[in-house]
UniProtKB/Swiss-Prot annotation:
GO molecular function, one term: acyl binding
Recorded GO CC terms: cytosol; membrane
Residue ranges of every copy of the Carrier domain listed in the record: 4-79
InterPro entries linked: ACP, ACP-like_sf, PP-bd_ACP
Keyword annotations from UniProtKB, A to Z: Cytoplasm, Fatty acid biosynthesis, Fatty acid metabolism, Lipid biosynthesis, Lipid metabolism, Phosphopantetheine, Phosphoprotein
Main location class: cytoplasm
Primary role: Carrier of the growing fatty acid chain in fatty acid biosynthesis.
UniProt pathway: Lipid metabolism; fatty acid biosynthesis
One biological process term in Gene Ontology: lipid A biosynthetic process
Organism, scientific name: Petrotoga mobilis (strain DSM 10674 / SJ95)
Residues modified to O-(pantetheine 4'-phosphoryl)serine: 39
Protein's name according to its UniProt entry: Acyl carrier protein
PANTHER family in UniProt: ACYL CARRIER PROTEIN (PTHR20863), CARRIER DOMAIN-CONTAINING PROTEIN (PTHR20863:SF76)
Amino acid sequence: MTKDELFEKVKEIIVDTLSVDEDEVTLDASFTDDLDADSLELVDLTMAFESEFGVTIEDEELEKIKTVENAVNLLSEKLNIDDED
């Protein structure tokens, strides 16, 4: 999986979980400011990421996820996806 493919999968999960338009989900979109996610939705999103990708996201890591790009970067790190394809 490439980072672009990861972003597309993350986008799909965000659209399904937060019921937002796909166009709204950009790398620099803030979960709370741009996508209007509340704390419960962020927990749901985290659980969806963990389930889909088979990873564990710690509370300290969750606190650092403010944008879609933060989530993609964290997941790519956990999945050992390199930028160089």
